[in-house]
């Protein structure tokens, strides 16, 4: 711990003391002449304690303000990230809206092309064409079914559009005229322009309404187009019927003319035969001359009628061929229209899905915008709170500075009025306190050094413990090996004892045999010397055995005697542990 001398009583602006914090600085202070030095010292101590409390309070306040500021900065960063995310989503939605507007323009162009084709087909001449009734009725039925299907799809689209408009009306009433819905069936281009120039959520909602209007209008256009096609087909059928009737009339007239020509030919042949039979009479000849002249004129007239009828037949055949070509063209057009009609529902479904997805995105954007507005309101509230806190902080700083100034003035006045003896006592006390603080500082330094040494010792202890664990593991391994060696030594000692016993038995047997041999073959004197030598040798052997069995290895702690050094070491480690 670091110490501060009491002569330096303040931390800021080199002031000797700080504010009391018990009241505002503008209050009138009591006269210092009425107080004794002891009371003044007590007041000084109180002022110092209050100053210390104020310092702690200011530190806590500053820490709280710092924490609050950090939280606000983190929150603002989060808001920035969310705003960036919302901007990216809005850009994607705008791109999708632009793509949908391009698709709408393409569909408009296709509808214009179809209308031009229908007008061209209606302008073609269909005066002298005809079709069979069965095929015409089938085509009429097909066109009627297509018209009914398109009307049903139109009704579905109108229902969807009405639901969307109701939803938009409800959302528009809740958001205070942020949404504008145009119910008039104007042109789609005007709605798209309004979408492009409208800001914020109005643009997103008007796009959905414009698309729904365009869809409904495209369905109406398709219906009108098919009605126009049906009218043109009915007109062509009427023209074909009239052409058929004319052809039938011409065929009947041709048949009648042919019959008349055949009758006249028969008459001429009959008259020629009569002329050959009756050549005598002149009167008859004159009559016959008059008759062929009239017949020739009639034949010429009939030939002229036949040629005119042939010309009319040829014209009728050419008109029939043209009508058949027109029929083929109309059939091809009908097939193309059927293909387009079969492709229109899938396109309508895709467009409906796009409208639904666009609507969902619009609703998401609206919800995000509302959330952003709420967050902006929260940020504004928190900014206002932060400004209030800053104002209070500034006021507290001003009060603190004023208190410091008043304390400086008080300390100056007190320092002028306090006696020299009191000052000496205070200086002595200050010196003693400084010395005590210095001694405590020295003690603290020594304690720090001892703590550092103890930490080093702890580190060495951890190292020593690790070494001890290694040594213990090695020792246990050596102990197990020594136990095995001890067991082997015990077995060898047992074997040696058995061998020694056998050796003693052999030696005793050898002595006895020697004694017997000496008793048998040697003199008695020599026997006595030999016996003495043998007795002496046996005594030496016994002494050597006794010396060998003397216990040398004993434990210094418990005094237990052990046969060898290895077992003694194992026993000593067990006793010590």
From Swiss-Prot:
Tissues expressing the protein: Present in aqueous humor of the eye (at protein level). Expressed in the trabecular meshwork (at protein level). Expressed in nonpigmented ciliary epithelium (at protein level). Expressed at high levels in skeletal muscle, also detected in heart, brain, pancreas, kidney, placenta and liver. Expressed in dermal fibroblasts (at protein level).
Annotated effect of mutating residue 50 to K: No effect on retinal ganglion cell death, decreased interaction with TFRC, loss of localization to recycling endosomes, loss of ubiquitin-binding
Entry's Gene Ontology molecular function annotations: identical protein binding; K63-linked polyubiquitin modification-dependent protein binding; polyubiquitin modification-dependent protein binding; protein-macromolecule adaptor activity; zinc ion binding
Keywords: Amyotrophic lateral sclerosis, Autophagy, Coiled coil, Cytoplasm, Cytoplasmic vesicle, Disease variant, Endosome, Glaucoma, Golgi apparatus, Host-virus interaction, Immunity, Innate immunity, Metal-binding, Neurodegeneration, Phosphoprotein, Zinc, Zinc-finger
Induction of the gene: Up-regulated by TNF. Up-regulated by IFNG. TNF and IFNG act synergistically to stimulate OPTN expression. Induced by glucocorticoids, such as dexamethasone. In an in vitro experimental setting, in which donor eyes are subjected to increased perfusion pressure (10 to 30 mm Hg) in the anterior chamber, there is no up-regulation in the trabecular meshwork at the transcript level for periods ranging between 1 and 24 hours. However, exposure to continuous elevated pressure for several days shows an induction of OPTN expression, with a 56% increase after 7 days.
Residues noted as binding Zn(2+) in the record, renumbered to the chain: 555, 558, 571, 575
Residues spanned by motif UBAN: 474-479
Name by which UniProt lists this protein: Optineurin
Organism of derivation: Homo sapiens (Human)
